[in-house]
């Protein structure tokens, strides 16, 4: 009778569970095993509760029955699996009672014991009646402290620093250098292939061009978004390149202007005067005048050009050097003349002599046999007119340093004869004469003037680099335009990283 009653009770329980929905069994089955596997293995450990010897018989029988019933899961269908799982849950209640008694005995003995259920949320969903149940295979965590959610570093506009800009510029230069190195061999190979087999090269080029155009058209016909995105990026890149080029050109022009003002202020041009001399042979000692500022009050018959305006030349503030060049014919008169003298006078605006410098000179001597040999050797150029029988005398005279009291207004060049000649005699025959005057600057000013172009370039480049660094530090948006796409990509990447991190934290819990 007892067996019949037990069989009838089991059949009634089976009928009762057969009427339930399939989702209940699947949910209970999945929740039961999800609770056991939810915690990460790195932070978990399993403890098996010790059982008292007094309750060994009941626990052993219940565990044997549960093992036997669980062994039949692989042989039965899904419905039998759910029934067996439910029966094991009932049997686990007895096991938990025995475990509770063992926990009480351990606590009475003073031993430390910690049981933390990691499936609290799942058991609450299953029912509040099972909240006090303790599974002997309960997973306990070593650390239950929840850390604050790490959202990752926040990217701002200042992350794109000068370091990244320098690195990118270096990468661009390296890639450009590699391209320049690889381009000549590639071009030579293509040219040689075109020379040796032009038709094949033309066919390959046409095939490549057609395939590229067809691929572009296919991608545009299938989906116009990549093409539009490419066009948008190219347009925006060209606009940014033009904008950055205009800003850099403006900085470069400003640097050149400032450098020009600095060089104009620092570099002083030396006074250089080159004038042809027209001597007045109506006087006993022929004279010629060269104006520095003005010779109006000095003489009435000026020699040479009178186009130097008053006030254009500020005077001889530095030491000067004067060179008088005279072209004389190798005539018998000049060879027999011998010595004569050239004098240069520095005159004020009123005609007073401020300083004077003299230099004796003569035609170069050569004996009669030497002149004959030279004439024989130069007979052809002399006959054709390429060479003339002339001599050029360059007379260098020391100048003076002008005082601030009386400025120099004019120069007077005079040819003086020797004392043995009567007035008007002893004057050489001259084809042409000229004067070259140059002021000698101080050492530092001379270096600045001689290196003015190099200094201009160096100052311009230094100012340009300083202006560029100043603009990048304080006015970066003025040089580098901001892009909304970059900010959106950073925000999207940041949000995706945060979501993935939060999902991982939720899964670990």
Swiss-Prot record:
Location (main, coarse): endoplasmic reticulum
CDD domains given in the database record: Seipin_BSCL2_like
Keyword set, alphabetical order: Endoplasmic reticulum, Lipid metabolism, Membrane, Transmembrane, Transmembrane helix
Species per Swiss-Prot/TrEMBL record: Arabidopsis thaliana
Free-text function comment from the UniProt entry: Involved in lipid metabolism and lipid droplet (LD) morphology, number, and size. Supports the formation of small-sized LDs and modulates triacylglycerol accumulation. Induces probably a reorganization of the endoplasmic reticulum into LD-forming domains.
Record's compositionally biased regions (Low complexity): 52-63
Membrane topology: Multi-pass membrane protein
Tissue expression from the record: Expressed in seeds, seedlings, leaves, stems and roots. Not detected in flowers.
Family: Belongs to the seipin family.
Bilayer-crossing regions: 238-258, 455-475
Cellular-component GO terms for this entry: endoplasmic reticulum; endoplasmic reticulum membrane
Free-text domain note: The N-terminal domain (1-230) determines the lipid droplet size.
Subcellular location: Endoplasmic reticulum membrane
Region (Disordered): 33-73
Gene Ontology BP term (one): seed dormancy process
Lineage of source species: Eukaryota, Viridiplantae, Streptophyta, Embryophyta, Tracheophyta
Protein name (record): Seipin-3
Keyword Protein biosynthesis part of the UniProt annotation: no
